Regions:
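A short, structured loop/turn motif at beta-sheet edges
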Residues: 73-79, 108-114, 136-142
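Short, solvent-exposed secondary-structure capping/transition elements
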Residues: 81, 129-131, 146
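Short, exposed beta-strand-loop hairpins at the edges of beta-sheets
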Residues: 122-140
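Acidic, glycine-rich flexible loop segments
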Residues: 88-128
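Residue-level detector of short, conserved catalytic/binding motifs and their immediate flanks
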Residues: 68, 116, 133
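Surface-exposed acidic loop/strand-edge motifs in secreted or periplasmic proteins
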Residues: 4-105
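A short, surface-exposed interaction/processing loop segment used at functional sites
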Residues: 141-149
Length: 149
């Protein structure tokens, strides 16, 4: 029929962001200077978000998730380094919600008596929906993740 072109099923090419974003922070704790680094690396892991038009037609939008590398230094000595992925937040957020989110940002919040503190932002692309998670890396290099209150 004549409307076949209007409903042609074509796969849309999504252009990934290839720029690595770097952040670093310096904090003092008990007279020791710590430097926390965050490297936000685009990946090829796809996140599909379904939205609906005014006519009720579903549209799948494809986004690319990030892998975030975090590390803590005291002077030139690296005390901790690890890649963080969205999969590490399973069990903290509902699976259905997590599947539509990307690991968007990470901030080094400081050092306290529990260890190195980071805060991750996971968000649903092109929406105001986001969740925060607090990451603690203990001085024994054990990591714990909790939903921010």
């Amino acid at each position: 029929p004549e409307d076949i072109l209007a409903f042609e099923n074509k796969e849309v090419e999504v252009i990934p962001i290839t720029e690595v974003m770097k952040k670093d922070s310096v904090v003092m704790y008990k007279g020791i200077r710590y430097r926390g680094y965050v490297y936000i690396n685009p990946s090829k892991m796809k996140v599909i978000r379904t939205s609906y038009s005014e006519d009720g037609i579903s549209v799948d939008n494809v986004y690319y998730d990030n892998v975030i590398h975090i590390c803590v230094y005291e002077g030139r000595q690296m005390l901790y380094g690890k890649d963080i992925t969205k999969k590490m937040f399973a069990g903290i957020f509902p699976t259905e919600t997590l599947n539509q989110m990307i690991l968007a940002d990470m901030n080094f919040m400081g050092v306290n008596n529990k260890g190195y503190q980071y805060q991750a932002t996971l968000c649903v692309p092109e929406s105001s929906v986001y969740s925060l998670a607090n990451i603690t890396i203990g001085f024994d290099n054990q990591m714990s993740i909790k939903k921010a209150e």
